[in-house]
A protein has these predicted regions:
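N-terminal "arm"/small-domain region of PLP-dependent enzymes with the aminotransferase-like
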Residues: 1-45, 137, 171
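PLP-dependent aminotransferase-like
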Residues: 84-143
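PLP-dependent aminotransferase class I/II
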Residues: 27-32, 50, 200-285
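Short loop-beta-helix segment that forms the pyridoxal 5′-phosphate
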Residues: 47, 59-81, 94
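Short acidic capping loops at alpha-helix termini that bridge into adjacent secondary structure
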Residues: 65-69, 177, 199-200
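Active-site phosphate-binding strand-loop segment of PLP-dependent enzymes
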Residues: 120-183
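PLP-dependent enzyme catalytic core of the Aspartate aminotransferase-like
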Residues: 157, 306-307, 316-358
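Conserved PLP-binding catalytic core of the aspartate aminotransferase-like
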Residues: 267, 277-308
Length: 358
């Protein structure tokens, strides 16, 4: 099983500017901070069971049915409760992808098979995936769209073909759309409109990245199969979504201008960063999200930390070796600092080697 390591360890590297965690570069909205402050008056009461008002706000924001919703203590909480509820015996996971899927599945004794994403295909899922499903016959699959750490989306035609294959084969399909808000035209990549027709589809989302509130822990999921949601709630601890998280979520959902402003910054800065990184000889992949996946010198993580920059070393992801990294897209002044440090720590031999590596 993969060692449990994530980005965002600012406590261990408290002297560093953090590019390892991928959140909205504008930071937490002031209205959300105020909602958390105001919720202090309610701390003497238990949190609202079922998150009724929050679910109504999410349903309105996502243009879906409240009955399809379940809320959790972050997306990770829902991944674990779904695994406990379904208790699958075999899963097929892309490699590389978000580590929490495997952590949750292994915790319930599930066998893991991997679909390895290849560098020569820019780490994209290929058209053979439906055939692999038929051959492997898993009980459940997890697909991250866009994928983490690569930032690549799955083509909508292929995604729908996978969904249809899963329905025909009796495979439960989980699509993690936590980073979908940061790609261009996210409505062209979501499967939300397929929920009613496909009860074996679960879509995962979170407030963490969109509103830069990883410390709050608030996620949600959609599924049209009420039995699945009931089973998840049955294996989840009571009051798993705090009063502060519920109030923060309702305030955050009103911040549409903030979300769009963050998106525009990401689109502009991502293009600028990719060009600068390529000029440094780094191998940059076509990430579509609010982070950039690239290949460089094997010692780059340590060199950057020494210069006060924390990047995500992706070598602990299955399917990746030493030299693969991920960096968040932040505000321009911060991104300039990253590029400055990357240039400082790149030896001439590194630049030459990186241009032809992988």
């Amino acid at each position: 099983m993969t060692k449990h390591i994530h980005g965002g360890d600012v406590y261990k590297y408290d002297h560093c500017l953090d590019f390892s965690a991928n959140c909205n570069p504008l930071g937490t909205p002031q209205s959300v901070k105020q909602a958390i402050i105001d919720s202090v008056e309610d701390l003497s009461d238990y949190p609202r069971v079922g998150c009724g008002p929050l679910k109504e706000a999410i349903a309105d924001y996502e243009h879906t049915k409240k009955e399809y919703l379940i809320c959790g203590n972050g997306a990770a909480d829902l991944i674990f409760s779904l695994s406990r509820a379904l208790n699958p015996k075999k899963a097929l996971l892309p490699a590389p992808t978000f580590a929490e899927y495997e952590q949750a599945l292994v915790s319930v004794g599930c066998e893991i098979s991997r679909y390895y994403l290849k560098e020569e295909n820019d780490f994209c899922i290929q058209k053979d995936y439906p055939d692999v499903l038929k051959r492997e016959k898993p009980d459940i699959i997890f697909l991250c769209n866009p994928n983490n750490p690569t930032g690549i989306t799955i083509s909508q035609d292929l995604l729908e073909e996978i969904l249809e294959t899963c329905a025909m084969q009796g495979i439960f399909m989980v699509v993690d759309e936590c980073f979908l808000d940061f790609v261009k035209d996210p409505q062209k990549h979501t499967l939300k409109e397929k929920l009613e027709k496909y009860p074996g589809l679960f879509i995962l989302k979170a407030f963490t990245k969109r509103y830069a509130i990883p410390g709050v822990r608030l996620g949600y999921g959609f599924c049209s199969d009420r039995e699945v949601l009931d089973r998840m709630e049955a294996v989840t601890q009571p009051w798993n979504v705090s009063t502060m998280a519920q109030q923060a979520g309702m305030a955050a959902l009103k911040e549409s201008e903030y979300v769009e402003a963050g998106r525009q910054i990401i689109f502009r800065e991502s293009a600028w960063m990719k060009e600068k990184m390529r000029q440094l000889g780094l191998t940059v992949y076509p990430s579509e999200a609010n982070y950039i996946f690239f290949y460089g010198p094997e010692e780059l993580f340590e060199r950057c930390v020494a210069k006060g920059i924390l990047i995500r070393d992706c070598s602990n992801y299955p399917g990746l070796k030493k030299g693969y990294y991920r960096v968040a897209v932040k505000l321009h002044e911060q991104n300039e600092k990253l590029i400055e440090v990357l240039e400082e720590v790149q030896a001439p031999s590194d630049k030459l080697r990186s241009s032809y590596s992988v």
